[in-house]
Curated annotation (Swiss-Prot):
<comment type="subunit">
    <text>Part of the 50S ribosomal subunit.</text>
</comment>
<dbReference type="InterPro" id="IPR036227">
    <property type="entry name" value="Ribosomal_uL15/eL18_sf"/>
</dbReference>
<dbReference type="InterPro" id="IPR021131">
    <property type="entry name" value="Ribosomal_uL15/eL18"/>
</dbReference>
<comment type="function">
    <text>Binds to the 23S rRNA.</text>
</comment>
<feature type="region of interest" description="Disordered">
    <location>
        <begin position="1"/>
        <end position="61"/>
    </location>
</feature>
<comment type="similarity">
    <text>Belongs to the universal ribosomal protein uL15 family.</text>
</comment>
<dbReference type="InterPro" id="IPR030878">
    <property type="entry name" value="Ribosomal_uL15"/>
</dbReference>
<dbReference type="GO" id="GO:0022625">
    <property type="term" value="C:cytosolic large ribosomal subunit"/>
</dbReference>
<protein>
    <recommendedName>
        <fullName>Large ribosomal subunit protein uL15</fullName>
    </recommendedName>
</protein>
<dbReference type="GO" id="GO:0003735">
    <property type="term" value="F:structural constituent of ribosome"/>
</dbReference>
<dbReference type="GO" id="GO:0019843">
    <property type="term" value="F:rRNA binding"/>
</dbReference>
<dbReference type="Pfam" id="PF00828">
    <property type="entry name" value="Ribosomal_L27A"/>
</dbReference>
<keyword id="KW-0694">RNA-binding</keyword>
<dbReference type="GO" id="GO:0006412">
    <property type="term" value="P:translation"/>
</dbReference>
<dbReference type="InterPro" id="IPR005749">
    <property type="entry name" value="Ribosomal_uL15_bac-type"/>
</dbReference>
<keyword id="KW-0699">rRNA-binding</keyword>
<keyword id="KW-0687">Ribonucleoprotein</keyword>
């Protein structure tokens, strides 16, 4: 075996299509472009989104809504997740990060009322939903907004 006699496996490589090289090639004359029409001409590509004169989709759909620049994004923690902490402990941002409840605090932490809380805790966060606040106080815990 020599390097100059190596050949690729059968079916591994394809011959490229040589277009416009005479009728005997099978791809001569119109060079696979068909007869006349916009796409047969040189530079005859159609713009992306063009729908043949019909009003294009991006202009048919309404321009609605906006994203507020000053929107605050809160990391969410549910009450059922707070049950990990011991009774009477103070649950603040650092405690939540250490236990893995919150990875990154963007604009703050919001406590939501999903699930049940069985222990009296002192919870410190930026925001609380009304039902979460009620559930924490009903168990005997305290709520502190930072």
């Amino acid at each position: 075996m020599e390097l100059n006699s190596l050949k690729p496996a059968a079916g591994a490589s394809k011959n490229r299509k040589r277009i416009g090289r005479g009728t005997g090639s099978g791809h001569g004359k119109t060079a696979t472009k068909g007869h006349k029409g916009q796409k047969a001409r040189s530079g005859g590509s159609i713009k992306a989104g063009f729908e043949g004169g019909q009003m294009p989709m991006h202009r048919r759909l309404p321009k609605r809504g906006f994203t507020p620049l000053a929107k605050k994004i809160y990391s969410v923690v549910n009450l059922s997740q707070l049950d990990v902490f011991e009774t009477g402990s103070c649950v603040d941002i650092e405690a939540m990060q250490k236990s893995g409840l919150v990875k990154n605090v963007c604009d703050g932490i919001k406590i939501l009322a999903t699930g049940e809380l069985t222990k009296a805790l002192t919870v410190k966060a930026h925001k609380f939903s009304a039902t979460a606040r009620n559930k924490i106080t009903s168990v005997g815990g305290t709520v502190e907004e930072i």
